Amino acid sequence: MSNAYKRVLLKLSGEALMGDDAFGINRATIERMVADIAEVVRLGTQLAVVIGGGNIFRGVAGGAAGMDRATADYMGMLATMMNALALQDAMRHAGIEARVQSALRMDQVVEPYIRPRAIRQLEEGKVVIFAAGTGNPFFTTDTAAALRGSEVGAEVVLKATKVDGVYSADPKKDPSATRYSSISFDEAIGRNLQVMDATAFALCRDQKLPIRVFSINKPGALKRIVQGEDEGTLVHV
């Protein structure tokens, strides 16, 4: 089966790395994610990753607790750096060559984000992990995913979540909620469906960059998406 996508941007939340733990990085969980990523890489699809930091620190929470919001956001960016290094290490153990590029310079640890270099590394078959969000406070890692996906020419943003798509209502609260197989950006806005934060969502819509929302906990889901199967929810123009 041929791949539906040549280049994709995978958005992983920091919380996804916790597994069943209350905090931090669950090694078994990250190894399972890397096994799914390895399948996609071996199929020949170029894969970039934007990773969050909510399993370690959330800037929004810090700001709400009285901390200076910009300072809290920078702390959140450093949390994404820790997650990116953990993901790179797990990939190395799985035989996948990965590079971490950071929006904040930390040259002794990771490479700075340089767009042409990132594209070249993707073309060479390496996984590129983007850390530190956009490098600016007040922007989420969802926005970083939309931005980096647009910059490197990804054909789709794959948003990995704990639910298997976009629903008409919260399925945990409403048993009658139905999952959308596909929905347009305008429909999602009109129905107030929280696919991503507004800035990220608007950027994807304006760049005509579709979003595929799927469950990171569903085995083989990432591979099925890359092969063009109907998995999760496609948000399109």
Swiss-Prot record:
It catalyses: UMP + ATP = UDP + ADP. One of its GO terms (cellular component) is cytosol. UMP binds at residues 53, 73, 134-141. The keyword Iron-sulfur does not apply. It is found in: Cytoplasm. GO terms for biological process: 'de novo' CTP biosynthetic process; UDP biosynthetic process. ATP binds at residues 11-14, 54, 58, 161, 167, 170. Its EC number is 2.7.4.22. InterPro entries: AceGlu_kinase-like_sf (IPR036393), Asp/Glu/Uridylate_kinase (IPR001048), Uridylate_kinase (IPR011817), Uridylate_kinase_bac (IPR015963). Pathway: Pyrimidine metabolism; CTP biosynthesis via de novo pathway; UDP from UMP (UMPK route): step 1/1. Keywords: ATP-binding, Cytoplasm, Kinase, Nucleotide-binding, Pyrimidine biosynthesis, Transferase. Homohexamer. NCBIfam families: pyrH_bact (TIGR02075). This is Uridylate kinase. The lineage of its organism: Bacteria, Pseudomonadati, Pseudomonadota, Betaproteobacteria, Burkholderiales. The gene is pyrH.
